[in-house]
Swiss-Prot record:
<dbReference type="GO" id="GO:0042981">
    <property type="term" value="P:regulation of apoptotic process"/>
</dbReference>
<feature type="domain" description="CARD">
    <location>
        <begin position="1"/>
        <end position="94"/>
    </location>
</feature>
<dbReference type="InterPro" id="IPR001315">
    <property type="entry name" value="CARD"/>
</dbReference>
<dbReference type="InterPro" id="IPR011029">
    <property type="entry name" value="DEATH-like_dom_sf"/>
</dbReference>
<protein>
    <recommendedName>
        <fullName>Caspase recruitment domain-containing protein 064R</fullName>
    </recommendedName>
</protein>
<dbReference type="Pfam" id="PF00619">
    <property type="entry name" value="CARD"/>
</dbReference>
Length: 95
């Protein structure tokens, strides 16, 4: 997996918001909890504060981006394993 930092994540934001599915978003939040990128409160806030799928996607990618390059790299890897089409649209590639 290439190094995929905050700058690259910001470039892929529109594709993420437009193409991500609710199930994928929930799985990604679970993965970020498991990787300790988020705590339970942060994860709950993303889901409970947003009713629309696109708003959940925005909150999720913005929260990860604020956490920095390491968090973005973990997130990119999780996206690549969950949804190849989404990863490709965001410019995430497997090496």
């Amino acid at each position: 997996m290439q190094n995929f930092g905050a700058q690259e994540m910001r470039k892929g934001r529109l594709a993420f918001v437009r193409l991500s599915k609710l199930e994928t978003l929930q799985n990604l939040i679970d993965k970020m909890l498991a990787e300790r990128v988020f705590n339970k409160g942060e994860a709950a806030d993303i889901l409970e504060s947003n009713d629309i799928r696109a708003d959940i996607a925005r909150a999720l990618i913005d929260s990860v981006t604020k956490k920095g390059d390491v968090a973005c790299s973990l997130f990119a890897g999780a996206i690549a394993r969950q949804d190849v089409v989404l990863a490709d649209a965001m410019g995430i590639s497997q090496v």
